[in-house]
């Protein structure tokens, strides 16, 4: 069985990353893809389920996992809450041939590249800052102050786009989703992947 690929997806809030991931997984009838579910010490929000949206743990449990080396990456964010990506879960799924997606920011991406040089990273850009702000306002979830803060963070996030392997501009959702699918397909056509997948055939073709 071929090893699955590990992907990083990053984007500023409002760029459509979560919607693209959801649409991608809906197309995955063979169940060959999954999004890593992060651990966090923050309290669940209304509608969030443990093990589905996040693994909700105490600070003590999280710090124990840190000491055990259980995280591929982790960070303590503004507000004092921890977020982390489980290493054993990712390794298990990759070994089963499942492609794993990490929905993380540029700081987490930098940590992971140091530990897993083979990881492929994709950055989702909005068509403009005006459109990004329009989408955030259109959600109807945040105050003007929160939106202003999100826009400030978005500009910081966008400034790291050039650290990624692929860039998708989400000006048209259908086209952006197709671009994402094409990236994943291209990664299955690399020399390394095809050699591993079709070694018997290649040996037969080269046999004298």
Swiss-Prot record:
Entry GO CC: cytosol
Alphabetized NCBIfam families for the sequence: guanyl_kin
Organism: Mannheimia succiniciproducens (strain KCTC 0769BP / MBEL55E)
Name of encoding gene: gmk
CDD domains, sorted: GMPK
Chief localisation class: cytoplasm
Reactions it catalyzes: GMP + ATP = GDP + ADP
Domain Guanylate kinase-like, chain residue ranges per copy: 4-185
Function: Essential for recycling GMP and indirectly, cGMP.
Official protein name in the record: Guanylate kinase
Compartments it resides in: Cytoplasm
InterPro entries noted in UniProt: GK/Ca_channel_bsu, Guanylate_kin-like_dom, Guanylate_kinase, Guanylate_kinase_CS, P-loop_NTPase
Entries under Pfam families matching the protein: Guanylate_kin
Domain of life: Bacteria
Coiled coil: none
GO MF annotations, alphabetized: ATP binding; guanylate kinase activity
Positions with a binding annotation for ATP: 11-18
Keywords, alphabetical: ATP-binding, Cytoplasm, Kinase, Nucleotide-binding, Transferase
UniProt record similarity statement: Belongs to the guanylate kinase family.
EC number: 2.7.4.8
